[in-house]
Amino acid sequence: MAASPDHDYERLGDKRLSLPDVIAQSVGFMGPVFSSAFVIPLVVGVISASGKGGGVAAPLSVLIAAVGVFALGWIVSSYSKQIHAAGSLYDYVTTGLGKRVGTAAGWLYYGGVVVLLTGLLLLIGGYLQGTLQSEFNISPLPSWGWTVVLTALIGVILYFGVQISTRAQLVLALVSIIVVTAFFIFVIVKLGSANSIKPFEPSSSADGWSGIFFGVLYGVLLFVGFETAANLAEETPNPRREIPIAVMTTAVIATVIYVIATYVEVAGFGYSLKTILSAAGAPLFALGAPAKAGSEGGRGGGRGACGSTGCWSSSCCST
């Protein structure tokens, strides 16, 4: 690499961020709980535009996607040992391929981040409004109003400094991951003898390797943002050490969570694509909801979670 480790970059902060802080940046941006709830159905293939996906073998698709993510993480880690700048990927590409390509990559990457965050804020605003209306019959704000409130809240947190924002991400990520992981473990324990290695066998995919690799394409989306710790290199006391550790640790954490989540969403619905499709919009909610709420996940007599959650009738796992 052409850049020197001592390259003189303008600093944004006073190097107060710890390793947990920069890990929180990557994990928080990646949003493993959100992705587990709404992106995994794409990996399975029940809501993908092509109609293809890993199917029952979706966990295998996630594992293969993780291999590529680890390779990318190694590249980012290698560059971060040499270049300690807030531009991260922009600076890496500029160093390797020149300013013109780096500028294009920077606009594409950070433009994509802005579009992604805008979309998420709109989605969350709509979800909050819809949930309050349907569950509590109240609607204090329209969906766009909640989006404005959330945007203002994020702005306030950022105003007080990156250390506050990363700590907030750390707390929120830990709480949400612990809760969801506990649910995953609960379902796996309740599955008992119904647990199987079937989701890790290529033959479990209805479309064979074609479907599995379609699942890989969507599986990569699960990891979007895992490399963003590199943006905080200027604000860490030892970026050569802490950024590579943060990036690779995030990749490991994400892989474990997503493989378990995908397995639970496949096994919890009785290894049945038809059943997964019936709850594709929000599979984790369906899997954990009581039968009186109309849940389809894990119902029935002998396969999948079948009575492991709040779902006790026999209509689902018989499919």
Segments predicted by a language model, with ranges:
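Short, Lys/Arg-rich, polar N-terminal cytosolic tail immediately upstream
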Residues: 1-16
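Helix-loop-helix junctions that connect adjacent transmembrane segments
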Residues: 12-13, 55-59, 135-145, 170-294
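Membrane-water interface regions at transmembrane-helix termini and the short interhelical loops
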Residues: 13, 79-82, 104, 130, ...
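Extracellular loop-to-transmembrane helix junctions
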Residues: 32-138, 253, 260
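Transmembrane helix-loop junctions in multi-pass membrane proteins
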Residues: 36-42, 46-49, 157-163, 310-319
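Transmembrane alpha-helical segments of multi-pass small-molecule transport proteins
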Residues: 60-64, 132-162, 180-184, 306-311
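Structural signal for membrane-spanning alpha-helices in multi-pass inner-membrane proteins
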Residues: 73, 154-158, 180-187, 262-266, ...
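Loop-to-transmembrane helix boundary motifs in multi-pass membrane proteins
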Residues: 99, 114, 144-148, 237-255, ...
